[in-house]
């Protein structure tokens, strides 16, 4: 009986007639590059890289602040028109050329090497501060093995006559975060010195990351079985627990109650586009590297669609979980506010217990206001409004380390829920860092600026060590301000520019027809009209619009940061402060340098090839990738120093 040949994708049967031919092609295409043990490892790694902390603490906030369920409409539309096409493009070029971000763009055109270097620089800078967040998570995780939790109550003062005033004026969760964890300074200019506990946690975070990335995909491929799946288990546990808590349904209803007027607000669409872009971890180079370890005939188109769907659904699922807990927190705050007012009324008017209840509270207030208005005004009762408590949504570190930790303190067996929550955040952050490290190590190897004989363990260790040394800046008292600066500028404008260059390079420099042929070679059929339209026009246009809007709004407004200042008049409200003038130089390094690397490298290669290229010199024999891109013969300018300067072949 003749066995039917099972091919990786339909449509390859005309080119691959037998099992022997298939095995031969796979071996030839694989070369010496490592490969994934199985498809599950690759998919879990990509999901772990794409699904990160932003899905948990930024997407729910955007939903709540942009019309609830109405925000889903632009989010899903832009996910299809922007996220999936660019994800497919990065998967395809990495898989076809089997190289990292630098090697891929060098192969497409030597003048595009700067795109890969820019991706590497952004991955390096983002990884530095992202792993600091993991260090904070570890600090909270270590402190979760206490009952009661250390952020559940204020500490007593030195005289033991009362509580610490800074904590009394704010809240236990605020005090533990800003004072006990960060020891925050009131201004960014005041470093506040190193906080040794954060330095230790930072060292643990980078050491754990190095161990997991020790041998590239050989080790990360094993780790993702835990880091990419455990967050879903913990989210499900929190959802089940959240739905049993009082007020959880109110939070979910508040999240998804649509305000269709928000669809007419341009910022809603631009925030949705930015969230899609960043939640896919596009333009970092990590996805290109991961896909390069695939078989050339892997169905990258199908992978892009599946991972995009998982990413989008995870964002929605996480929002439901988060707002079920926020609904519980808002209900607890509402009840505390109401009970406090009732107690004040009972003491003022000497009323018996149970005389005022939640059901007759509003009527009783109206009665007092009409009968004894002067006394009523002097009471200064708090405003207890459920919608106000629900709308006090925050994003980022505020959601994780303040809002959620406060909600956890109100749960029974709070240490258990705290441990689970920070394990989930740790896994989300760590799996994302796998891609960031890959986005630095692989291009570093492709650039050949370090000895080739060094094993990958040394490359990874060197990247982690240098990153740890530079990330010490985030362990200062002003560390949170520096982290916010890096987050706002290192991972914004440069990524948009890189993504735009990627799409334009593939569509108009490499050529969309050649790219279509490559995809047909890999998966057996050419991309359909949807992919053609998005790659050629729609996706680049969306990215360009997001970039222009972001650039214009950033340039036109004064740059400020939010500071914790116990001496301010409005404390505990966070104070908005202006950056010092010298900070603009830092912003240029974070945003400008990675973006300018792209034209700078192209200009360097143009000058070198046109004026300093010696075709007969053996040291330049490998300076171009193919005959098509080799420059014409130009006069060679002698001079030992100039010759040495332009003879490097790492670009």
Predicted feature residues:
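Hydrophobic, membrane-embedded alpha-helices of multi-pass small-molecule transporters
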Residues: 44-54, 126, 131, 168, ...
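Juxtamembrane transmembrane-helix boundary signature
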Residues: 39, 44-45, 51, 73-109, ...
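Membrane-embedded translocation segments of transport machinery
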Residues: 2, 6-36, 217, 221-437, ...
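Extracellular/lumenal N-termini and interhelical loops of multi-pass eukaryotic membrane proteins
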Residues: 131-190, 248-262, 329-405, 499, ...
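Transmembrane helix-boundary motif of multi-pass solute transporters/channels
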Residues: 41-77, 88, 213-219, 286-294, ...
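Membrane-interface "cap" regions at the ends of multi-pass membrane proteins
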Residues: 2-57, 86-91, 101, 114, ...
